[in-house]
Each structure stands twice: as C-alpha cells, then as structure tokens.
C-alpha cells in the first residue's frame, strides 16, 4: 500500500495511489514494507509551515509500525522546525520501543542541516533506504 500526500495552502490532501507528485512546498509519501515497516519519503521544504504536517504523519506511522525509515534525500530545505519534528519523532520512537531511521545522503541538504547543528549524532542515520532497513535488524 502506498500513501501520497501533498501540502498546499496549509492543508494536506491525500492523493491516493497516483503517479509521482511534485510540489514547491512539501511532498510526503508512505510505503509499507510489510506489516511493521514504513518508509516515509519526504521531498521539498521542511519549515515552520510544513513541519506540523510531517509531525502528524510521523506520529501516525510510529503508532502503526515498529520501524519507520524517513527518506530525506529529496529535501531541499530543512529548518529548525523540521529538525525539531525529527527529534521529537526519535524521542517518541524510543519511548514506545520503536525504531526511527533517517536516510541522509552525505551531499544532501538534510546532511548539511544535521552537520551545522551538530544533531547528526542524535539520530540513527543511513545513506540509503536499503542500508537503513539492513541496519535496523
């Protein structure tokens, strides 16, 4: 099952199983990899406007699955509000005995934000979704 959503004008609209989406603000996709694994693919900008939608989505996925992988490869901007959401999701996963992994390519925007803030060590980080899935075993 695949879920796709797109944030427009402060509202998240579910678009079902449609083809690839592009948005100037935020693109969120959730793919099930078995009953207890979700991959959340994030594209666009994670800022004060879009971070609450990501927060809601990650909270829901952590309630539904024991492993959530957040693929940040297509993120063009990761602000402090986005970092806060990722940190809160990591804390939630720890409290609920769940696992959260971030996919952060070395040359990506998300990696720059994690390095600039020194927060990279606070997260489980892998360079690819496959590596995150393998490392989580």
Predicted regions and their residues:
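The feature encodes the CheY-like receiver
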Residues: 78
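STAS-like cytosolic regulatory interaction modules
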Residues: 1-74, 88-137
């Amino acid at each position: 099952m695949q879920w796709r959503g797109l944030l427009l004008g402060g509202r998240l609209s579910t678009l079902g199983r449609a083809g690839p989406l592009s948005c100037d603000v935020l693109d969120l996709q959730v793919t099930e990899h078995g009953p207890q694994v979700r991959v959340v693919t994030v594209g666009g900008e994670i800022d004060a406007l879009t971070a609450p939608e990501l927060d809601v989505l990650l909270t829901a996925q952590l309630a539904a699955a024991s492993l959530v992988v957040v693929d940040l490869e297509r993120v063009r901007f990761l602000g402090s509000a986005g970092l806060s959401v990722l940190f809160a999701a990591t804390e939630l996963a720890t409290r609920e005995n769940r696992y959260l992994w971030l996919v952060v390519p070395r040359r990506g925007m998300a990696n720059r934000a994690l390095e600039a803030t020194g927060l990279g060590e606070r997260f489980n980080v892998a360079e690819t979704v496959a590596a995150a899935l393998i490392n989580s075993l």
